[in-house]
Structures are given as C-alpha cells and as structure tokens.
C-alpha cells in the first residue's frame, strides 16, 4: 500500500499519549500494510496528516490476543516497541467496541502485552523485562553489562546507561534537563559504532527518588513530546543505580507517565493517558 497505489479515501484515527502522537490505521480486513513512502507521507506535518509514528492494527496472531499491531517511525522505518503506542492501541480497541474487559492482551512486534484500563483515558501496559546484556540491546564493544558505559564522542567522554525495552535505549543523566544538548548528543549517539542498530537516547534529571524529568531523542523521529519505552528505560537504569525508587513518575514535555518495576527480573509496567484526538479521512 504505497502513495501511488493506496485506495483513497483512507480512514484513520489520530491519537496521542502524553503528546506522543500517532496515525492509527485499521487493517484488520487484510489490507496490506503501508510502505516506507506512504508512512513518511502520512507522518508529514505539512503535506500529510502529521505524527511521530504510524500504527497499523491487524488481526490477532495468538490465542487470547485481541489484536496485533505494527509501528513505523515518521521516516518510514519500522519500530519494535512503543509504550505510548501500546496504550493508544488499547484505547482504540476499547473505543471501537472490540474489547469490553478491563484486562486484555495485545501483540506488538516483539511480544504480547497485558493491558489494564485504570481510569478514563488511562491505561497501564506491561512492557516486559528490561534487557541489560550488551549483545542483546545491542551494544557493541562491551562484553559485560554494567551500570554505566563510557563512550568517546567526537573527542568528548560521554557516560550513559544502556538497556533494551524491546528496542535499544541509551540513558544520559544530566543536571539541568532544560539545557541538555538533546539533538546534538542524540544524533551523534544514534550514529555511534557502539549502537549498530542506532538507539533511542534519553536525557534524564533526577528531582527526587520518586520523580524525574526526561527528554527523548527517538530513532527515526527526533525529539518527541513523550516516549513510553524511553520512560521505562530511564527509570530502570536509575533504579539499577539506586537513584530512584521502584515506582517513579516521569515528567516529559508532553505529560507525565508512571513506571513501576517492583522486582528485578520482573516485568515493567507503564501507566499514562491515551486519547483519541479525531477521526479523519485522507484523500492523498
């Protein structure tokens, strides 16, 4: 389904979770997924609809799962994980009438997620286990996991944490989040040889053991108003260091998320808003 071949009009829903916005397509009827060109076209904020990512809802792939979904970044590249997107998929399914239960399963490209409705336009999603082993993030040049990695970045020494939440994340702790060099360091880290699949880069400031501020420079999208998997990544890295507790609020430019990781070796839970902005028709 490309720009030239897509059948117009194309119905869609615009959704957002803490300002991280999505164009959601219902492809449960077997319609082919969008190609790179169409995703980039839909995501364009001037000539298309405009979003950080495009989500396609597809038929379930497993037993007990209500729906599956795929995610693409604004540049058309595929994404493996998106916590805000998962909540928006859940909200879309509830609004559509596809699910009536307070607890249900949805399939992302990397795993099934248990979702709970916890209030009006509020959802909690199990994000799975954080992965700290370098080869599984992937992070090259470091045989063993550690709390902090030291990288050379154009003559600078940069210290960061690294973790996979189904997608790779680097976490840089800063003193003042408002003046952090998010775009410069973020783009350099995404091109660094240590991250062969590129990386989402989070810049985090600890306010107190239960509260942090975060900005995220995402693969294929640049800085976004919020990043759910990035919030989880920053929180678990800080938890591993003993910098915050096991239940932390993460304040991003677009809103506040809650990350809970009760025990190491257990799943991480991400909670926050997910709302429909509008339904629309795209005419190409």
Curated annotation (Swiss-Prot):
Subcellular localization is given as: Cytoplasm
Tell me the active site. 82 (proton donor), 227 (proton acceptor)
- What processes in GO biological process is this protein linked to? lysine biosynthetic process via diaminopimelate
GO CC term, one of those recorded = cytosol
The pathway that the record names for this protein is: Amino-acid biosynthesis; L-lysine biosynthesis via DAP pathway; DL-2,6-diaminopimelate from LL-2,6-diaminopimelate: step 1/1
Q: Sorted alphabetically, which Pfam families does this protein's record hold? A: DAP_epimerase (PF01678)
Where does this chain mainly localize? cytoplasm
| Residues the record marks as site: Could be important to modulate the pK values of the two catalytic cysteine residues | 169, 218
The reaction(s) annotated as catalysed by this protein in its Swiss-Prot or TrEMBL entry are: (2S,6S)-2,6-diaminopimelate = meso-2,6-diaminopimelate
Q: Which residues hold substrate?
A: 20, 53, 73, 83-84, 167, 200, 218-219, 228-229
Q: Which residues does the annotation list for site: Important for dimerization?
A: 278
Which Gene Ontology molecular function entries are recorded, alphabetically?
diaminopimelate epimerase activity
Per its UniProt record, what InterPro entries does this chain match? DAP_epimerase_AS, DAP_epimerase_DapF
EC number assigned by the record: 5.1.1.7
For this UniProt record, give its keywords in alphabetical order, as a comma-separated list.
Amino-acid biosynthesis, Cytoplasm, Isomerase, Lysine biosynthesis
Query: Which enzyme type, at the first EC level?
Result: isomerase
Q: Member of which family?
A: Belongs to the diaminopimelate epimerase family.
Q: What does this protein do, in the record's words?
A: Catalyzes the stereoinversion of LL-2,6-diaminopimelate (L,L-DAP) to meso-diaminopimelate (meso-DAP), a precursor of L-lysine and an essential component of the bacterial peptidoglycan.
Quote the PANTHER family the UniProt record gives.
DIAMINOPIMELATE EPIMERASE (PTHR31689:SF0), DIAMINOPIMELATE EPIMERASE, CHLOROPLASTIC (PTHR31689)
Q: What is said about its interaction partners and assembly?
A: Homodimer.
Name by which UniProt lists this protein: Diaminopimelate epimerase
Q: Which organism is it from?
A: Xylella fastidiosa (strain 9a5c)
What's the name of its gene? dapF
